[in-house]
From Swiss-Prot:
Regulation: Feedback inhibited by histidine. Also inhibited by AMP and PR-ATP.
Name of protein: ATP phosphoribosyltransferase
GO molecular function: ATP binding; ATP phosphoribosyltransferase activity; magnesium ion binding
Keyword line: Amino-acid biosynthesis, ATP-binding, Cytoplasm, Glycosyltransferase, Histidine biosynthesis, Magnesium, Metal-binding, Nucleotide-binding, Transferase
Enzyme class: transferase
Originating gene: hisG
Presence of keyword Magnesium: yes
Keyword Cell division among UniProt keywords: no
PROSITE patterns (UniProt xref): ATP_P_PHORIBOSYLTR
């Protein structure tokens, strides 16, 4: 059994979000030795326990107060929320923040040789899915009646197996759909990973640890979205150079020895279109442009 004074975090044991969740916690400075067969791991340097479970169990563990935090895909969270509401429950939790990984979309797909004239093409059809509540909400809003075929895996084979006329499943690249003779025709839900917290009173020590963890997560995500830039820039065009680089703060300007026409500029920027930006900087007279990744960041 885990100590109740320790912060309990549920994450996916294996699958789409597992590696990214582990990396996020590691970058936040949480030292955890995760063994393949061990479902509970204790952090070495913080009062934190990691529960490694199936992803569709995580929302319930948080909503039922079994764990304090959960890292989960929004698609799984929303499906469980709709499921509990359909059963007359009032599930409670807090979404602390959206994370920067686990992006996917829940889409409708039909056989490539069938005509598609919009969602009405599915009226009266049988649709295979692992997300019956999300599918029902979407098609109910469109006024479309359908028959649901619930599958917990290999949804994409349902049309060829004669189990369904279409599917509603997660899509990342679309390669799996194509391999099974299907095409994506409608996106019904877009999802990323998120961090959720249980409802109810939290011990002060746990809440302080959660606040610290949130600050570190913000720093990790901000660092991944930013770059550290160094360059030599002409003094008469500094404003134009700065305008090209949206930054967290104003840049640091340093004189260059023996050069009155240029200065050294250091800054953190959230700019992502960097080849095009570097070409524009060079056209303004900038030189020795270095773009470096940032491991950690705190404003």
């Amino acid at each position: 059994m885990t100590d109740n004074t320790r912060l309990r975090i549920a994450m996916q044991k294996s699958g789409r979000l597992s590696d990214d969740s582990r990396e996020l916690l590691a970058r936040c400075g949480i030292k955890i030795n995760l063994h393949t067969q061990r479902l509970i791991a204790m952090a070495e340097n913080m009062p934190i326990d990691i529960l490694r479970v199936r992803d569709d169990d995580i929302p319930g563990l948080v909503m039922d107060g079994v764990v304090d935090l959960g890292i989960i895909g929004e698609n799984v969270l929303e499906e469980e929320l709709l499921n509990r509401r359909a059963q007359g429950e009032d599930p409670r939790y807090f979404t602390l923040r959206r994370l920067d990984f686990g992006g996917c979309r829940l889409s409708l797909a039909t056989p490539v040789d069938e005509a598609w004239d919009g969602p009405l093409s599915l009226n009266g059809k049988r649709i295979a899915t692992s997300y019956p509540h999300l599918l029902k909400r979407y098609l109910d809003q469109k006024g479309i009646s359908f028959k649901s075929c619930l599958l917990n895996g290999s949804v994409e084979v349902a049309p060829r197996a004669g189990l369904a006329d279409a599917i509603c499943d997660l899509v990342s690249t679309g390669a799996t759909l194509e391999a099974n003779g299907l095409r994506e025709v409608e996106v019904i839900y877009r999802s990323k990973a998120c961090l959720i917290q249980r409802d109810g009173e939290m011990e002060e020590s746990k809440q302080q640890l959660i606040d610290k963890l949130l600050t570190r997560i913000q720093g990790v995500i901000q660092a991944r979205e930013s770059k550290y830039i160094m360059m030599h820039a002409p003094t008469e065009r500094l404003d134009e150079v700065i305008a090209l680089l949206p930054g967290a703060e104003r840049p640091t300007i340093l004189p260059l020895a023996g050069d009155q026409q240029r200065v050294a500029m250091h800054m953190v920027s959230s700019e992502t279109l960097f080849w095009e930006t570097m070409e524009k900087l060079k056209a303004l007279g900038a030189s020795s442009i270095l773009v470096l990744p940032i491991e950690k960041m705190m404003e």
